[in-house]
Amino acid sequence: MCGIVGFIGEQDAKEILLKGLEKLEYRGYDSAGIAVQAENGVVVYKEKGRIAKLREIVDENVAASVGIGHTRWATHGVPSKVNAHPHQSTSKRFTLVHNGVIENYELVKKEYLQDVTFVSETDTEVIVQLMEQQVSTGLSVEEAFRNTLSLLHGSYAIGLLDAENPNMIYVAKNKSPLLVGVGDNFNVVASDAMAMLQVTDQFIELMDKEIVIVMKESITIKNLQGETIERAPFTAELDASDIEKGTYPHFMLKEIDEQPLVIRNIIQKYQDENGEIELDQDIRNAILDSDRIYIIACGTSYHAGLVGKQFIEKFAKMPVEVHVASEFSYNMPLLTERPFFIYISQSGETADSRAVLVQTNEMGHKALTITNVPGSTLSREADYTLPLYAGPEIAVASTKAYTAQLAVLSILAADIAKAKGEVLDFDLTHELGLVANAMVQLCDQKEEMDALAKQFLATTRNCFFIGRSVDFYVGLEGALKLKEISYIQAEGFAGGELKHGTIALIENGTPVIALATQEHVNLGIRGNVKEVVARGANPCIISMKGLEMEGDSFVLPAVHEALAPLVAVIPLQLISYYAALHRECDVDKPRNLAKSVTVE
């Protein structure tokens, strides 16, 4: 959610900043801007809309080797050119970009900035105006920066230019991700490493409430007390090709096709030398010492958590609760005596999940993060991490991270089951290999998926997904995918709940996508399909081989029933993708959405 880049060196800063912002497009944004230190002062370019539009207004003839850039996802103030970053102080001495939310910005306005005329509706402008006010009291820029930050409550990642000190960028962070990249006679700033892989793979991780003075040949990290901190850079384990589409028209389609490889990679990463599943002994012991597992997540990760609950309870016979992170803090249940928390987040930066983690850490409870980004905030602040090994996921709508989460959760459940002496009736690694094979088959059936999307979804206003048992949870994820990228009003329901109200919405032609992968509820979901057909619905039944019946729209390759969610979701991802194409929607960057949701 939002993205920051910065560059200081000898090269053309404008192009590096623009390319960096393009690499951050996946995070979601509605406007973008850059500011560069030119010969006659700081020049700001910003636009509502795509970075391509911003490129059109950037003057190629302006020479600059220092600058900052930003993609904005609106929180305070509508998406507009005025509200886009960078923002400047009244005198234009200071120019600033900011990710996060300043919770007390109105109070700061009232107490310190009564005489300032504000240009935008944003909380961000308060920071840059406060910076100017603090300098006006006689403080040095560094002192003013520290004072300014001490007066702010909330989250921030900040990049600041000072027109009177053009050879440095001031940087700070609190509860919002930010890295400093190290180069040869240049340095960079970025919300994540992908933005600046074009110039370096060496990055320094910043901690909360740290200030950094970035110059061409040096990086100085200090705490809010002004004490210098030494920290070595790390090498980003990414390749520039990982964040390119290659021959694919969209990242989403590329990432759907990568899922078989991801599953095989996960199997390999979590096997010991004997081919047995083997997790960290400390993770296993911490879970075995607990009396209940609490899974905390948002969105797609929450849906993965629902399936994960089934894995853990069925395999390991341990009780599990799954909670939406944004509600957990306000409605925390009565916890058991020895709870263990699992946080699921693709980015590892989800603000709602982090807020809960902070609470449970303060309570002294052990926590595990399942994430695609080791070294992320959740990974650092939890006791343990299980990586997804899915590779960068660029499309806003999650696909391969979801199936990776399911695979890792199944491995975790099997490992705990083994430690408890619970015997599975199947070989998990073998069956996951069959899942990967089935995924390959499904990814080769794109024409069939396109035809289903055209038949059922090309012109509809709404759509319902139904399933029983674990198919219900897969249906929730299918509905989310469809609404995210095609803007169809799509909802997932438990098949048995239709008659308790939702069936009132069924009318002639309403598409209902039904999942039938579980033998013990196959007849039940078939009965639900008949109920909606009787009211005029247009049914699309996706069943598992061996459970299919005449009239089914698509039959999945057979896999072990427990792992059916990993294959059942593939057609739903592809159908959503093609529905979005038929409706001429922006598949990789859907409106109003952000990939990494870093505000609460």
Curated annotation (Swiss-Prot):
Residues 2-217 form the Glutamine amidotransferase type-2 domain. One of its GO terms (cellular component) is cytosol. It is found in: Cytoplasm. One of its GO terms (molecular function) is carbohydrate derivative binding. Keywords: Aminotransferase, Cytoplasm, Glutamine amidotransferase, Repeat, Transferase. Catalyzes the first step in hexosamine metabolism, converting fructose-6P into glucosamine-6P using glutamine as a nitrogen source. Homodimer. This is Glutamine--fructose-6-phosphate aminotransferase [isomerizing]. It comes from Bacillus thuringiensis subsp. konkukian (strain 97-27).
